[in-house]
Amino acid sequence: MNDTPNDIQKPKQGKRFSERLPHWLRQALPKGSVFDFTDKTIKRTGMATVCEEALCPNRTRCWSRKTATYLALGDACSRRCGFCNIDFTKKPLPPDPDEPRKIAESAKILQLKHIVLTMVARDDLEDGGASCLVRIIDTLHKELPESTVEMLASDFQGNVDALHTLLDSGLTIYNHNVETVERLTPVVRHKATYRRSLFMLEQAALYLPDLKIKSGIMVGLGEQESEVKQTLKDLADHGVRIVTIGQYLRPSRLHIPVKSYVTPETFDYYRRVGESLGLFVYAGPFVRSSFNADIVLQDMENKQSKMAKT
């Protein structure tokens, strides 16, 4: 995947890393009554969100439009990935049996039409937590039957039975992030492998061919352009149809350092490369796998509808 279609122009290189953010990574942080309502709802129901635990830079923007991404199976992870701010523990607490009710209650109060769930990795559980996730999703389908559900799942350590258990729950979107290019995977997420992630994505596509399958990567970690293009090709070849690409921003000095700030023009370039492979790509400096997930789904469905009419 080293060749680039002639009609896709390459952008200028982005800035090398410094502590000072470039202008395209500075944003106003809107807060107001809607943000406060979302914040109070989440605190009242006692649910963890990846927005808070991962120090997501989009939290105020998302909560100001009454959306949030719920973090299932606790707020402490059995893995310690170099990019992630979620707490690590060698002995996670047992799953909360009341979690399905809490998430459903919060989603009903916020009137979510598209509910996004993610999870901490639970390598301590035999099925990686898949059966617990199904109970959450079943409750959401029961309490909010008109809402769609998107699940950003772990790799379940390659357990295909656990994957099938999750997929049988009636998801609208199954999401599993490869996070970075193959060369950097051992550094960025040392307990996962690039090929295992591709395998799980492909298994999902084979099991439910009509399911919308999504993955995402971060850039600015030291990857080469050719590696990003190869990753997009790998994702397309393994059944993925939606890809998110965003700038890596380290949560603290204890995390993997940023190697470069990727320009908006480069994100647009990667979007066009992905589209040339048949992917629906949502790319930009602040894009995260769950950012504007409802809008991404709607945009993809609108695009598919237009294509079907032509």
UniProtKB/Swiss-Prot annotation:
CDD domains: Radical_SAM (cd01335). One of its GO terms (cellular component) is cytoplasm. Pfam families: Radical_SAM (PF04055). Residues 63-280 form the Radical SAM core domain. It comes from the Bacteria. Keywords: 4Fe-4S, Cytoplasm, Iron, Iron-sulfur, Metal-binding, S-adenosyl-L-methionine, Transferase. It is found in: Cytoplasm. SMART domains: Elp3 (SM00729). Pathway: Protein modification; protein lipoylation via endogenous pathway; protein N(6)-(lipoyl)lysine from octanoyl-[acyl-carrier-protein]: step 2/2. Belongs to the radical SAM superfamily. Lipoyl synthase family. PANTHER family: LIPOYL SYNTHASE, LIPOYL SYNTHASE, MITOCHONDRIAL. NCBIfam families: lipA, PRK05481.1, PRK12928.1. This is Lipoyl synthase. The lineage of its organism: Bacteria, Pseudomonadati, Chlamydiota, Chlamydiia, Chlamydiales.
